[in-house]
Amino acid sequence: MARTIMLQGTGSDVGKTVLVAGLCRLAANAGLTVRPFKPQNMSNNAAVADDGGEIGRAQWLQSMAARTPSSVHMNPVLLKPQSENGSQIIVQGRVFGQAKGRDYQRLKPQLLGAVLESFENVCAGADLVVVEGAGSPAEINLRTGDIANMGFATKAGVPVVLVGDINRGGVIASLVGTQAILDEGDRAMIAGYLINKFRGDVSLFDDGIRAIEGFTGWPCFGVVPWLQAATRLPAEDSVVLERLARSGTGALKIAVPMLPRIANFDDLDPLRAEADVELVFVRGGERLPADASLVILPGSKSTISDLADLRVQGWDRDLAAHVRRGGRVIGICGGYQMLGRTVRDPLGIEGGRIEAAGLALLDVETEMAPEKTVRNSQARSSEYDVSLAGYQIHLGVTRGPDCVRPSAIIDGAPDGALSADGRIMGTYLHGLFGSDAYRARLLQSFGLSGERRNYRDSVEQALDEIAGELERHLDPHWLAGLLG
């Protein structure tokens, strides 16, 4: 029988994902069979699991930390926002349907069975399963039918450790306040708490620990310092992008418009990690920088809607000027679709406008189709004749004259398009910048000749460093009980 523990937070972005990844790596280093699990995730950053189907990329990273194959059962419910109040629902890796917020609340009891089935699957054969909650259990307005936090924990009988973020301030109030508004049954599930993102002398918080224990009766299982290594992990959500508006001061400036429904933006992390690259995420109300050598249009969960927003910001004019100056453009997935002449959605799959004019930087057209392509892929770059490894998650088929110059051969078939002068490139392959040889050749084409790090190795090293920090700062008796 697998041991289980669930990390829940006093709020969003308290660091649960990194802590789960760190605990998974710590357990894996101790020789345990450990697996991550998140009942419900909301993210447009998706991965293709090793057994096929979509999961949140955070759970994919956690499976990497656990040194175990990823599975759709590690994240049985994935919500991919398409509009301000509506999301596509992925259940056990497959599209289940679409729902707005209130409709989804009514669906949750129906989804609980799939969540518990997946949890049983993940537990089978494991020594330890580390579960991540979503948001906070303090959102008691969402408690009825909950499958993400206490609703899951009580049904599955998983003890909870509450995580508070001291870096944002008010951590004592957030922990004590969470206990105050939980009902008695939910409070009983909490075994203790962790303080995360502490800076400075930990002994200065001794009085805080005593105060929290006095108010709640909960033991403190550790005070975790600010984990600098976590900045080398792939970005999980757009909250992180807001903080990373500008990354690096390198010789090559790359601009990325922050589309409202941006998806799979962790494609850009390998470029962000390069010291000689300045990656600029351009917010609404800002111009695309005129001195950028390359503009990357990232993935989008709603291509037609994001194309309209791109025009509202005037970025279409900025892109046209960029190309006239000799600049280069790469479009990935939804960004590739935007580069063409037209995007059509005759079945209303994206739920918005039926047709939109594209940027006409590539002579191609896209039509959305109900069948979703979801697969891991091996490819070869047509530009640089190097191997690529990545994945595809997209709706739609793109055709046109520029497709006779494919940007890559994926699983033996042509993919994407290149303009006649080679300055505009589109592809459906996510993860191409994570292929070290491709990234090196791309940067060489801009005159950068420095040695390139192995991106995967840098992520592995960061996970090991985080595991080491947790081993040093978590309560040894609690940790010994967890690791058995």
From Swiss-Prot:
For this UniProt record, give its keywords in alphabetical order, as a comma-separated list.
Answer: Cobalamin biosynthesis, Glutamine amidotransferase
- Indicate the secretion signal residues: none
| UniProt record, GO biological process | cobalamin biosynthetic process
InterPro entries given for it? Class_I_gatase-like, CobQ/CobB/MinD/ParA_Nub-bd_dom, CobQ_GATase1, CobQ_N, CobQ_synth, GATase_3, P-loop_NTPase
All residue ranges annotated as the GATase cobBQ-type domain in the record: 251-438
**What PROSITE patterns does this protein map onto?**
GATASE_COBBQ
**Active-site residues, as the UniProt record annotates them:** C333 (nucleophile), H430
A Pfam family cross-referenced in the UniProt record is GATase_3
Pathway(s): Cofactor biosynthesis; adenosylcobalamin biosynthesis
Alphabetically, the GO molecular function entries are: ABC-type vitamin B12 transporter activity; catalytic activity
Q: Which family does this protein fall into?
A: Belongs to the CobB/CobQ family. CobQ subfamily.
Q: Which NCBIfam families match?
A: cobQ, PRK00784.1
What this protein is reported to do is described as: Catalyzes amidations at positions B, D, E, and G on adenosylcobyrinic A,C-diamide. NH(2) groups are provided by glutamine, and one molecule of ATP is hydrogenolyzed for each amidation.
Name of the protein described by the UniProt record: Cobyric acid synthase
Organism equals Rhizobium etli (strain ATCC 51251 / DSM 11541 / JCM 21823 / NBRC 15573 / CFN 42)
Q: What is the phylogenetic placement of the source species in the record? A: Bacteria, Pseudomonadati, Pseudomonadota, Alphaproteobacteria, Hyphomicrobiales
